[in-house]
Design a protein with these regions (language model features):
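Short Gly/charged-rich anion-binding patches and loops
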Residues: 17-18, 94
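Conserved active-site tyrosine of GNAT-family acetyltransferases
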Residues: 18-23, 99, 126
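Vicinal oxygen chelate
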Residues: 1-7, 29-88, 93-124, 132-136
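Short acidic-aromatic low-complexity motifs
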Residues: 12-16
Length: 136
């Protein structure tokens, strides 16, 4: 029986740069950085203190995708056309200030929504994530 999600794949353009961004700027914990026999790098992070789902930072060129498909994915990532998901926060405005000071690009400033306060960031590859502080 499925019990939940373990990993969510996030396509990145450069795994070294992504590792730096997610650990140094977003403050995620590095959980794995392994070279597999097939040449793929298994690079995972998750929020500090979390024991749940991890982000698998994947380079399309070193995945199970064929060459042309990997190039299409890279182009979509670089264009900022992909949104891997929503990150939860307890203080959207405070995180906005702290992350902005670290050079994280915000494509949407914190704004009140029916479900909470939301801001949107773009990672160093072009992916965008919603940062959401839910009401109550």
């Amino acid at each position: 029986m499925i019990m939940g999600m373990s990993f969510v794949s996030v396509w990145v353009l450069n795994q070294d740069s992504a590792k730096e961004f997610y650990t140094k700027k977003l403050g995620c914990a590095l959980t794995n950085d392994l070279k597999l026999d097939n040449g793929m790098r298994w690079l995972t992070v998750r929020p500090q203190g979390s024991t749940g789902q991890e982000l698998l930072l994947m380079d399309p060129a070193h995945s199970m995708l064929d060459g042309p498909t990997a190039e299409q994915v890279r182009a979509l990532v670089a264009k900022g056309a992909l949104s891997p998901g929503v990150m939860a926060t307890s203080d959207c405005r405070g995180d906005h200030a702290a992350l902005s000071a670290l050079g994280v690009e915000f494509v949407q400033e914190p704004a009140v929504r029916p479900y909470g306060v939301e801001a949107v960031i773009r990672d160093d590859s072009g992916n965008w994530f919603s940062f959401t502080q839910r009401h109550g």
